[in-house]
């Protein structure tokens, strides 16, 4: 996994993850915009295989925010979460009469950005 960060946003990328991008996107759509703790709880109880690499990338992004930017993990929110297609792994299955059928095993690239939530306490003046 490669990692990078900006001033108020920390990012993490998981590249060449085994699994199709569309199946990873359906999980990322559920956690986008949530807090770090809520996202971890949701990922723990989802019945999808793609939650494991997503959890690893999310924890890496939070570790980047904590170590590189000095942000508190309890105040972090998932600002962006994307899954893009990676190159397929090409495999071949032997078939009848000496033929071979191609099998493409999909890979994807997962990118997650976390940023600090801005808690605004607006007091009404009477």
From Swiss-Prot:
It comes from the Bacteria. The keyword ATP-binding does not apply. Signal peptide: none annotated. GO terms for biological process: translation. The keyword Iron does not apply. Keywords: Ribonucleoprotein, Ribosomal protein, RNA-binding, rRNA-binding. One of its GO terms (molecular function) is structural constituent of ribosome. This protein binds specifically to 23S rRNA; its binding is stimulated by other ribosomal proteins, e.g. L4, L17, and L20. It is important during the early stages of 50S assembly. It makes multiple contacts with different domains of the 23S rRNA in the assembled 50S subunit and ribosome. The globular domain of the protein is located near the polypeptide exit tunnel on the outside of the subunit, while an extended beta-hairpin is found that lines the wall of the exit tunnel in the center of the 70S ribosome. PANTHER family: CHLOROPLAST 50S RIBOSOMAL PROTEIN L22-RELATED, LARGE RIBOSOMAL SUBUNIT PROTEIN UL22M. Belongs to the universal ribosomal protein uL22 family. Part of the 50S ribosomal subunit. This is Large ribosomal subunit protein uL22. It comes from Prochlorococcus marinus (strain NATL2A).
